[in-house]
């Protein structure tokens, strides 16, 4: 459904919600203004955009260690006052965001607009070089690549991830709900995700040798196999002696019988 820009602007002025949130509310409400306002209030998005420009310098740095101690997260989430920073709803939000980061192994940035230009260009070069686009016209290739890049960049962005506890909203919408609820600007500033052994090339060790070394024993040596010496080369058979030549009998040597 196509939504008139004037309708989006009017809804924004009435609710203080963001432009994209107003557009989505109108689309889901069939263009009905009152239903769209109710939709925004139910989502907790009304009034969030007005507070988003305020300076948020308070907040909390929280951590989360996943079961098994193999994944750890540190995240900084800011709010405007220390009063809200001590609020249990805010603390729960920060902890939920930390758990979200632990669950999202591809996430590297807070939002799409924080992704460096060189990363965007690299992703574009990868997509442009794929074989399935080789025979496509240039204008079609550009549209396909743009769509793929937008999808890929959202995979790298924390705020664009579906919330792990309610996949019907994104992390960004979760934050906006708390902005409306707590009455202050809230923003995820930065985070770091640790994975045990990440980036380390593990040396392969012979398990039997390692156990023997820990026990102070020498690893058993493989039994030596005696090599059979090669047989001497066979001597060639002696050539047969040449046959003796028979001498012709002398004439007149035989006696005649009388």
Swiss-Prot record:
One of its GO terms (cellular component) is cytoplasm. It comes from the Bacteria. Residues 216-258 are annotated as: Disordered. Residues 229-241 have a biased composition (Pro residues). Keywords: Cytoplasm, Elongation factor, Protein biosynthesis. Pfam families: EF_TS. PROSITE patterns: EF_TS_1, EF_TS_2. It is found in: Cytoplasm. Residues 81-84 are annotated as: Involved in Mg(2+) ion dislocation from EF-Tu. The keyword Methyltransferase does not apply. GO terms for molecular function: translation elongation factor activity. Residues 249-258 have a biased composition (Basic residues). InterPro entries: EF-Ts_dimer_sf (IPR036402), Transl_elong_EFTs/EF1B (IPR001816), Transl_elong_EFTs/EF1B_dimer (IPR014039), Transl_elong_Ts_CS (IPR018101), UBA-like_sf (IPR009060). Coiled coil: none annotated. Belongs to the EF-Ts family. NCBIfam families: tsf. Associates with the EF-Tu.GDP complex and induces the exchange of GDP to GTP. It remains bound to the aminoacyl-tRNA.EF-Tu.GTP complex up to the GTP hydrolysis stage on the ribosome. This is Elongation factor Ts. The gene is tsf.
């Amino acid at each position: 459904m196509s939504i008139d820009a004037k309708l989006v602007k009017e809804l924004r002025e009435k609710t203080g919600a963001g432009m994209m949130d107003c557009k989505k509310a109108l689309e889901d409400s069939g263009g009905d203004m009152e239903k769209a306002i109710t939709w925004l209030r139910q989502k907790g998005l009304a009034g969030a955009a007005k507070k988003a420009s305020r300076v948020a310098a308070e907040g909390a740095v929280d951590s989360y260690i996943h079961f098994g101690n193999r994944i750890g997260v540190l995240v900084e989430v800011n709010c405007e006052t220390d009063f809200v920073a001590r609020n249990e709803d805010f603390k729960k939000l920060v902890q939920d965001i930390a758990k979200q980061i632990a669950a999202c192994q591809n996430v590297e940035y807070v939002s799409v607009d924080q992704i460096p230009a060189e990363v965007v260009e690299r992703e574009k070069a990868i997509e442009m070089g794929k074989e399935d686009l080789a025979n496509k016209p240039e204008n079609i290739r550009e549209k396909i690549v743009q769509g793929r890049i937008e999808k890929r960049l959202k995979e790298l962005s924390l705020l664009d991830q579906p919330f792990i506890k309610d996949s019907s909203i994104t992390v960004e919408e979760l934050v906006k709900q708390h902005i409306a609820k707590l009455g202050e600007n809230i923003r995820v500033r930065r985070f770091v995700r640790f994975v045990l052994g990440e980036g380390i090339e593990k040396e392969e060790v012979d398990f039997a040798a390692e156990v023997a070394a820990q026990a102070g024993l020498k690893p058993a040596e493989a039994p030596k196999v005696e090599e059979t010496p090669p047989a001497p080369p066979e001597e060639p058979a002696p050539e047969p002696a040449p046959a003796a030549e028979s001498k012709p009998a002398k004439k007149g040597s035989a006696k005649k019988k009388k």
